[in-house]
Every structure is written in C-alpha cells, then in structure tokens.
C-alpha cells in the first residue's frame, strides 16, 4: 500500500495519494453519517451526502494547508516538490538532494500551514454558529469543516507530536527550536 498515485500538480507541487488515503477517508463516512443523524437529525441519505461533502472539504483544506507550507518553503529558498496524502493527513515532500538546512529554515517552513486553516475555521465559524440551529446537510457540513480546520489542521498542527513516522508541524518546530538552542549554547 505504499504506491502513490499522481492527482495533479499545483504551483509546481506534485500532489499524490496512496490507496490507504482513500480507505481512511472512506472509513469516515459511517461516523460522520451517524453524527449527522444523531446531532443534527439528518436522514440517512442526508447524512451520507453531508459526509461526502465533509471528506471532500477535508481533503481540499489539507491541500491548502500543505500549499501554505509550499509557499513558506519557496519564500526561504528551499521549495517543496510534493504533497503525499497517506491518510487523512499528508506529508510535505522536499528534494532528496536538499542540503542540510539551518533550524530557522525548517521552523519557517513548518509555520506555513496552520495559520491558513485557523483563518478558514474562523471564517466559517459565524456560518457554523448561525447554521447550528438549522438542520440540514449544509449546516452539518459547515460546522464539521469549521471545526476540522480550526481544531485539527490549525491548533492541532501546533501540537509537539514527533514520533516514528508521524510528525506534525509543532513537532518539527519543537525539534528544530531545541536544535537551534543547543547550537546557541555551544557557541
């Protein structure tokens, strides 16, 4: 399941996905459908439609998050070459021959994505609050998309998670911040 498929290229960034990515998104359909039916009194059909829109928007906003990293990477002179979707989340791909970079460069690149999703979540929040008392596909979709962007891709991206095979932006920032401070202590 490590094979990647090319989806498209945006701003010279190649976007790929794995079969596991498709599976993990599809796995979200039953819980989102259940939540829509339970919390918003959606019918089964409405829950399925809302779930479809939610997972499509999750995928799109994950790409927007990564394109924020691509913009930051380009601005520091060491651009990204790809985005690899391996589950609900994705990884920034950099050239294999990239030279060792100073910690500040890694930190600037890691800071490129979260703020976009905070803004998306905040921009959708008034609509989410307004629509919360209105049942329907649009209401549930907007509420879920606002929450996903603000809490997961925005604030969640800043958590200092860094363990084998899974590092989020906050983990990268903490790792290179410690490295930067070690270098200062030596000097």
Regions found by a protein language model. Give the residues of each.
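Hydrophobic transmembrane alpha-helices and their immediate loop junctions
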Residues: 1-187
